[in-house]
Regions:
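Phosphate/diphosphate ligand-binding glycine-rich loop within oxidoreductases
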Residues: 37-145, 268
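Positively charged, low-complexity intrinsically disordered leader regions
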Residues: 1-65
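Adenosine-phosphate binding glycine-rich loop
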Residues: 257-258, 263-308
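Rossmann-like adenosine-cofactor binding region
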Residues: 198-275
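Phosphate-coordination loops involved in phosphoryl transfer and adenosine-cofactor binding
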Residues: 43-48, 155-159, 257
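Glycine-rich phosphate/diphosphate-binding loop of Rossmann-like nucleotide-binding domains
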Residues: 53-65, 149-222
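Short, structured coil segments at secondary-structure junctions
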Residues: 70, 121-123, 181, 199-201, ...
Length: 308
């Protein structure tokens, strides 16, 4: 299969074949990262702008390192240092960036759909590094890559996503990707944080941790955002941890080869106990490692269409 998109905006729009192509390409780039010399000339002569209008550490650093390993020229921009603070519109800002003959814009924004809006209006490639509560496609892809690497495939696999599904772009990207590849998906958390409409697309919804994880092959625990407590979505962090935090006694009742995942940053002893995060079933740090290969793959594939 050939990649034909100049943008990566979300997993909702991708076919199973396109997702698999990204994962296969990432597997090749992971081999590059394991060599002594980790750099390849795939994006030499191309310029990538990392435009993060919303704060980020892991995703921004991962993208920047991926770009360096592909030999791209890199420009890092943040909203605080841009003309957005002077009243310039987002579209005018990115139009001016494009006028400098850049090839790719990697963007994170707090507004849902911001990347889709600018991608329709730019000739350069746009990669979504997270938009509002909509999607975080490269996080979804690195989670899929990690699952495939550990489990061999997705058909019939039981994957449970626990936490704040309502506000999570990570959850949405995971759900779309997992369903397209044939996994069975369960989402669980407080009723205020788990929309029932997911049932309409074949996702199992429950509000009990034990029910969600007993038959799971993979458990992906999402960060609880403390700011949601002030909005009345749940009584308190302690109560959330009591009902939905994954602890060692529960692990003993689960499948012995279950994968424990988390997109980070972790709130230890809230979403999961420290001993679970650091335990033998945890692949959390492997997710971080795999994110580099996945982002190299995405940059490489999208850049190939921009060149054309």
């Amino acid at each position: 299969m050939q990649w034909k998109r100049k943008d990566l905006l979300g997993l909702y729009d991708l076919s199973a074949g396109e997702i698999t192509l990204i994962l296969d390409t990432a597997a090749e780039f992971k081999k590059v990262s394991e060599r002594r010399v980790k750099k390849v000339p795939a994006l030499r002569g191309m310029t990538v702008v990392n435009f993060f209008v919303e704060p980020s550490t892991r995703t921004r650093v991962s993208f920047e390192l991926a770009e360096q390993r592909l030999s791209a020229d890199i420009v890092n921009m943040q909203a605080q240092a841009s003309s957005l603070l002077k009243g310039e519109t987002l579209l005018d800002t990115v139009k001016n960036i494009e006028a400098l003959q850049v090839d790719l814009v990697v963007m994170r924004h707090s507004a849902t759909g911001a990347q889709n809006f600018i991608a329709d209006r730019l000739k350069c490639g746009v990669i979504n590094a997270g938009d509002g509560a909509h999607e975080h496609p490269t996080q979804g892809l690195l989670d899929l890559f990690t699952i495939r690497e550990k489990k061999g495939g997705f058909k019939g696999l039981n994957v449970s996503i626990i936490g704040d599904i309502l506000h999570s772009r990570v959850a949405r990207s995971n759900i779309w990707g997992l369903l397209k590849l044939g996994a069975n998906v369960t989402v669980a958390g407080p009723s205020t944080l788990v929309p029932r409409e997911f049932e309409e697309i074949g996702v199992r919804v429950c509000h009990n941790l034990k029910d969600a994880v007993m038959d799971a092959d993979v458990v992906n625990l999402l960060r609880i955002q403390h700011e949601r407590q002030n909005n009345g979505f749940f009584p308190g962090i302690g109560e959330y941890a009591s009902h939905f935090g994954l602890k060692a006694p529960m692990m003993e009742k689960m499948k012995s080869d279950v994968l424990i995942m988390h997109p980070g940053p972790i709130n230890r002893d809230v979403e999961l106990a420290g001993e679970v995060a650091d335990g033998e079933n945890s692949v959390i740090l492997e997710q971080v490692t795999n994110g580099l290969a996945v982002r190299m793959a995405v940059l490489f594939l999208v850049a190939g269409c921009v060149k054309k």
